[in-house]
Amino acid sequence: YCKNVNKALDEIVRVLKPGGVLVCSTYGSRHMQEISRLVSGYDKRIALEADKLFEKFGLDNGDKILKKHFSDVERRDYKDALVVDEAEPLVDYILSCHGNQKEYLVDKYTDFKKYVEKKLGKPMTITKEAGVCACRK
């Protein structure tokens, strides 16, 4: 979520004690892609992310960025998925995202919830593409 990843990493390297470890997590471009498709199916104008944060620092490029600042970078992918069978928690999650969805959904909450309930005729498996990197100077 920082604007200048390299500047933030420079500062972390500066203050990290000898023997210290930075552990950071991130996600990839396919993380929760089913939710984005679900929302887009309701209204194509909705974007759940204001910025594609995974493009600034994600699974596809994070270790390369970290290796510019740290001599030892170990990446571990976290294999996981989420199975959702209730509409209300999913709708609440969607409304909590950092995009423009509130602009289009707040006044249509009931209609959108019915749309999600219909789409959840059976449990939905949601891709979770995430991982962590452990970094040493």
Label every PLM stretch briefly.
Residues 1-2:
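A short His-aromatic
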Residues 6-7, 13, 19-82, 101-106:
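Conserved catalytic/acceptor-binding region of the Class I
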Residues 53-137:
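Conserved Class I S-adenosyl-L-methionine
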